[in-house]
Amino acid sequence: MSESTTTIETAWLAIGQIVAPQGLRGEMRVNPSSDFPERFLIPGPRWLRRPRQTEPEVVELERGRAIAGKNLYIVQLAGITSREQAEALRGCELLVPASDRPELDEGEFHVLDLIDLSVIDQASSTPLGIVRDVVSAGNDLLVVELTDGREVYIPFVEAIVPVVDLAQGRIEITPPPGLLEL
């Protein structure tokens, strides 16, 4: 998995959302939508998109750290020094330029590339649905909207998802009995 899609064209990748202030000195909790922790740990420029805004503004990440046992990061942005200032940023998205996408190893994919791929039953070539999201868990789960409108979670493991063909816009699956009935 990797960064999630964002509603701002394809020039930006959403890497997380500010969910709450942390403490009294302007730190914030961020719910990541990126599998690349350096996005929250290494100081440097990031971009902030406020709700109902289309253009992001540049911000400087001063420092960040992971919260042990939780899928959250604590970040400090330059100029944010109080809990009230941090609270005002609740709901904002942190972004990076799409050109900052890290190179991936064979068999790894960016979430943005998986969204909207067709899902096909490999044995019968029957169209089953469309990938709508990817959820991080022990193994990543593909959130698939089936052709009948139901939503199912498909483990994103090679035994069940042997083919990901980005060029053809499709994923082939070999679902075990009962997986699509859950």
Swiss-Prot record:
Primary localization class, coarse: cytoplasm
Role played: An accessory protein needed during the final step in the assembly of 30S ribosomal subunit, possibly for assembly of the head region. Essential for efficient processing of 16S rRNA. May be needed both before and after RbfA during the maturation of 16S rRNA. It has affinity for free ribosomal 30S subunits but not for 70S ribosomes.
Assembly and interaction partners: Binds ribosomal protein uS19.
Family: Belongs to the RimM family.
Provenance organism: Synechococcus elongatus (strain ATCC 33912 / PCC 7942 / FACHB-805) (Anacystis nidulans R2)
Gene3D superfamilies, per the entry: PRC-barrel domain (2.30.30.240), RimM (2.40.30.60)
Domain named PRC barrel: residues: 106-179
Compartments, record wording: Cytoplasm
Identification of the protein by name: Ribosome maturation factor RimM
Sorted UniProt keywords: Chaperone, Cytoplasm, Ribosome biogenesis, rRNA processing
GO biological process entries: ribosomal small subunit biogenesis; rRNA processing
Domain notes: The PRC barrel domain binds ribosomal protein uS19.
Record PANTHER family: RIBOSOME MATURATION FACTOR RIMM (PTHR33692:SF1)
GO cellular component: cytoplasm; ribosome
UniProt-listed Pfam families: PRC_RimM (PF24986), RimM (PF01782)
Keyword Cytoplasm annotated: yes
Record has rRNA processing as a keyword: yes
GO molecular function terms noted in the UniProt entry: ribosome binding
